């Protein structure tokens, strides 16, 4: 019985942690229009093949976003338009 309770506690903790991580990712994505974090890349490099590029942040302007370069952290920024 004790093992079952411990197992349930561990399972609920894993689910909670997963939800929190997904929630933070979703919030960050909404804030910076981030699709995913890129391991490597540069200004204008393709990220997902749908007009995205690797960059450190997205600067929204009109119908598309400009990407700026930062070697420490890469985001995948979605462009809209040209």
Curated annotation (Swiss-Prot):
Disulfide bonds: none
Subcellular location field: Secreted
Protein keywords: Disulfide bond, Neurotoxin, Secreted, Signal, Toxin
UniProt entry tagged with the keyword Plastid: no
Protein modification: May contain 5 disulfide bonds.
UniProt GO MF annotations: toxin activity
Signal peptide: 1-19
Tissue and organ expression note: Expressed by the venom duct.
A single cellular component GO annotation: extracellular region
Entry text on domains: The cysteine framework is XXX (C-C-CCC-C-C-C-CC).
Functional summary from the UniProt entry: Probable neurotoxin.
Name of this chain's protein: Conotoxin Cal30
Organism: Californiconus californicus
